[in-house]
Curated annotation (Swiss-Prot):
Sequence similarity: Belongs to the glycosyl hydrolase 5 (cellulase A) family.
SUPFAM superfamilies: (Trans)glycosidases, Carbohydrate-binding domain
GO BP field: cellulose catabolic process
Coiled-coil segments on the chain, per record: none
Binding site for substrate: 65, 69-70, 96, 131, 231, 263-264, 291, 296-298
Class in the EC hierarchy, top level: hydrolase
Listed Pfam families: CBM_3, Cellulase
Reactions it catalyzes: Endohydrolysis of (1->4)-beta-D-glucosidic linkages in cellulose, lichenin and cereal beta-D-glucans
This protein's name: Endoglucanase
Entry GO MF terms: cellulase activity; cellulose binding
Length: 499
């Protein structure tokens, strides 16, 4: 009998060990309270999110990608795994309005309801996210928003785990006082008729970065918070300064979206910068939600391509971002290492290496061609291999097909390469960049590439509005500029990328 027991125990241990990457479930032990059972109804006290006992609470979790694209990852099984294995206390369901979202595909709302019902059963908080993005002004679909939030608040107004996010990322020619605040007042009024208590989060200008503007003209509702969004590879101390200003004005902040990547969603990951951000959020007890739960082949995704859609993920199923985020939600010491990439924009660039000079071949504000002329100069003491160097000219293509011609290059037009890149998330003054490179050649210390004259045009030859383009300025002589950025093997070495 003892021998049989010994054999059984040995087999059991072998079985457990061979499960290898299967992860422990810290929240699944019998008797563990769910986040909602533990904290109950949330409210605002000063700038702080607090639970039913008035104690500060910091929610941590993850956001879906667009429900219309990656909705299969949003289900009770996956959310249960995230609660039990990752330790999430909040899940954000990102329901796009445009881009195949609810405006054109009303059935997406059913996936939102599925997410809320699953969160209710699992006892986690859930953010109902009206995910405006390419439709940058929330007023564009205001009546649809009011209709949607009327329905959601009537269904879930007595459910303490529901949080409403009524405008994901206002952007473009939008400001707080004229556009966002009046919109928010109308939508909040609709929600409050059915739900007097639950938290409402309002997006801020410039893709939810301008919390300072919202802080200067605050909404009157006692349980409203302002959304702050950041991507660790793009946004640094300048954005934390905005957050500090908002807090000093008594405006509560909820980070409903942040990524370990750059703002495109697909550069990085930037783990050192992410650690700096999370340390800051912890110091202020600011709640956060990471972007995103999907297997999309980009660096901000938490899962590797082909990962299960219902949870049960091994460590080997998680991306570098997913591994980092899971460990930081759990509060364990992360063991991940940075993947070398472009550094954060607020890091100092190399001043004594190569630089770029620019002049406008066509200074017209409205023209059917953009004609940048530039030359790259080696200010350092060592020879530069040009095949490792690329330059980016940042501008607005407005979703039109792009073409480029080389009119003249001292190094030879045949030695110059080009690539157009559309940004995942438009930046201030740019939704596209033209990347210029070289097939071969070197730059000795003190040498220059000489003049490179380019000409861009739309497929339909329609006009550009250059005045709003990040890299453009009107000059008929060459001037040094940091708004055309330079890279050595993909690493930023000169200039400042747009916000």
């Amino acid at each position: 009998m003892k021998r049989s027991i010994s054999i059984f125990i040995t087999c059991l241990l072998i079985t457990l060990l061979t499960m290898g990457g299967m992860l422990a479930s810290p929240a699944s032990a019998a008797g563990t309270k769910t986040p909602v059972a533990k904290n109950g109804q949330l409210s605002i006290k000063g700038t702080q999110l607090v639970n039913r006992d008035g104690k500060a609470v910091q929610l941590k979790g993850i956001s879906s990608h667009g429900l219309q694209w990656y909705g299969e990852y949003v289900n009770k099984d996956s959310l249960k795994w995230l609660r039990d294995d990752w330790g999430i206390t909040v899940f954000r369901a990102a329901m796009y309005t445009a881009d195949g979202g609810i405006i054109d595909n009303p059935s997406v709302k059913n996936k939102m309801k599925e997410a809320v019902e699953a969160a209710k059963e699992l006892g986690i908080y859930v953010i109902i996210d009206w995910h405006i993005l390419n439709d940058g002004n929330p007023n564009q679909n205001k009546e649809k928003a009011k209709e949607f939030f009327k329905e959601m608040s009537s269904l879930y107004g007595n459910t303490p785990n529901v949080i409403y996010e009524i405008a994901n990322e206002p952007n473009g020619d939008v400001n707080w006082k004229r556009d966002i605040k009046p919109y928010a007042e109308e939508v909040i009024s609709v929600i409050r008729k059915n739900d007097p208590d639950n938290i409402i989060i309002v997006g801020t200008g410039t893709w939810s970065q301008d919390v300072n503007d919202a802080a200067d003209d605050q909404l009157k509702d006692a349980n409203v918070m302002d959304a702050l969004h950041f991507y660790a590879g793009t946004h640094g101390q300048f954005l934390r300064d905005k957050a500090n200003y908002a807090l000093s004005k008594g405006a509560p902040i909820f980070v409903t979206e942040w990524g370990t990547s750059d703002a495109s969603g697909n550069g990085g990951v930037f783990l050192d910068q992410s650690r700096e951000w999370l340390k800051y959020l912890d110091s202020k007890t600011i709640s956060w939600v990471n972007w995103n739960l999907s297997d999309k082949q980009e660096s901000s995704s938490a899962l590797k391509p082909g990962a299960s859609k219902t949870g049960g993920w091994r460590l080997s199923d998680l991306s570098a971002s997913g591994t980092f985020v899971r460990e930081n939600i759990l509060g364990t010491k992360d063991s991940t290492k940075d993947i070398p990439e472009t550094p954060a924009k607020d890091k100092p660039t190399q001043e004594n290496g190569i630089s770029v000079q620019y002049r406008a071949g066509d200074g017209s504000m409205n023209s059917n061609q953009i004609r940048p002329q530039l030359q790259i100069k080696n200010n350092g003491n060592t020879t530069v291999d040009l095949k490792d160097v690329t330059a980016r000219y940042w501008y607005n293509a407005k979703n039109k097909g792009q073409n480029v011609d080389c009119d003249y290059a001292q190094l030879g037009c045949g030695n110059v390469t080009y690539k157009f890149v559309t940004l995942h998330k438009p930046k201030q003054g740019a939704d596209t960049y033209l990347e210029l490179g070289f097939k071969n050649g070197t730059l000795a210390p003190g040498a220059s590439t000489g003049n490179i004259q380019l000409r861009l045009h739309n497929d339909d030859w329609s006009n550009y509005a250059q005045s709003g383009d990040y890299s453009f300025f009107k000059s008929n002589t060459f001037k040094t500029t940091k708004k055309i950025t330079l890279y050595d093997q993909g690493k930023l070495i000169w200039g400042t990328e747009p916000n």
